[in-house]
């Protein structure tokens, strides 16, 4: 499971012109499910997202987590993050989970996030989405579980 974490001042996701998820300060995370993933990987990714220290403390040091600052968490499914780009001029998606597994694990991740954190929003799995964000920093990390 992969998560592209971006610290944002605000972000929203639209589907067909309708806002389906939005947060103020927090983390926008693009999530890719891979074929061998299970709920265990989803749990580990969520733990890292909630506790990864990417927000600045009073001294300007990245020392605070999403939980510490009470920020929002916007989860967006993005199977293209699992692409194999090592060869050729066209990405291969054989390294991405089948849609049914991707949907199941993304939904599980979302439900667990909502159970463990107050401010959680998401895009719509499998939809053509427009993601709007204001990067903060920018601070971006690729997490692979």
Swiss-Prot record:
EC class (word): hydrolase
Subcellular compartments: Cytoplasm
Keyword Nucleotide-binding: no
BP GO annotations: D-amino acid catabolic process
Alphabetical list of Pfam families matching this protein: Tyr_Deacylase (PF02580)
E.C. numbers: 3.1.1.96
Motif (Gly-cisPro motif, important for rejection of L-amino acids): 137-138
Example of a GO cellular component annotation carried by this entry: cytoplasm
Main location: cytoplasm
GO molecular function ontology, one term from the record: Ser(Gly)-tRNA(Ala) hydrolase activity
Recorded coiled-coil stretches: none
Keywords, comma-separated and alphabetical: Cytoplasm, Hydrolase, RNA-binding, tRNA-binding
Keyword check for RNA-binding: yes
SUPFAM superfamilies with a match to the protein in the record: DTD-like
InterPro entries, per database record: Daa-tRNA_deacyls_DTD (IPR003732), DTD-like_sf (IPR023509)
Annotated CDD domains: Dtyr_deacylase
Catalyzed reactions per annotation: glycyl-tRNA(Ala) + H2O = tRNA(Ala) + glycine + H(+); a D-aminoacyl-tRNA + H2O = a tRNA + a D-alpha-amino acid + H(+)
PANTHER family (alphabetical): D-AMINOACYL-TRNA DEACYLASE 1, D-TYROSYL-TRNA TYR DEACYLASE
Free-text note on domains in this protein's UniProt record: A Gly-cisPro motif from one monomer fits into the active site of the other monomer to allow specific chiral rejection of L-amino acids.
Similarity section: Belongs to the DTD family.
UniProt subunit comment: Homodimer.
Task performed by this protein: An aminoacyl-tRNA editing enzyme that deacylates mischarged D-aminoacyl-tRNAs. Also deacylates mischarged glycyl-tRNA(Ala), protecting cells against glycine mischarging by AlaRS. Acts via tRNA-based rather than protein-based catalysis; rejects L-amino acids rather than detecting D-amino acids in the active site. By recycling D-aminoacyl-tRNA to D-amino acids and free tRNA molecules, this enzyme counteracts the toxicity associated with the formation of D-aminoacyl-tRNA entities in vivo and helps enforce protein L-homochirality.
Name listed for the protein in its UniProt record: D-aminoacyl-tRNA deacylase
Protein species of origin: Pseudomonas putida (strain ATCC 700007 / DSM 6899 / JCM 31910 / BCRC 17059 / LMG 24140 / F1)
């Amino acid at each position: 499971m992969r998560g592209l974490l971006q610290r944002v001042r605000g972000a929203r996701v639209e589907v067909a012109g309708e806002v389906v998820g939005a947060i103020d300060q927090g983390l926008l995370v693009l999530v890719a499910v891979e074929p061998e993933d299970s709920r265990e990987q989803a749990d580990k990714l969520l733990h890292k997202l909630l506790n990864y220290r990417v927000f600045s403390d009073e001294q300007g040091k990245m020392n605070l987590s999403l939980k510490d600052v009470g920020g929002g968490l916007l989860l967006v499914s993005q199977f293209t993050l699992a692409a194999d780009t090592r060869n050729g001029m066209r990405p291969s998606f054989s390294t991405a989970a089948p849609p049914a597994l991707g949907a199941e694990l993304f939904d599980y991740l979302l439900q667990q996030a909502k159970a463990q954190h107050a401010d959680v929003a998401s895009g719509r799995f499998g939809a053509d989405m427009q993601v709007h964000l204001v990067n903060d920093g920018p601070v971006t990390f690729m997490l692979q579980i």
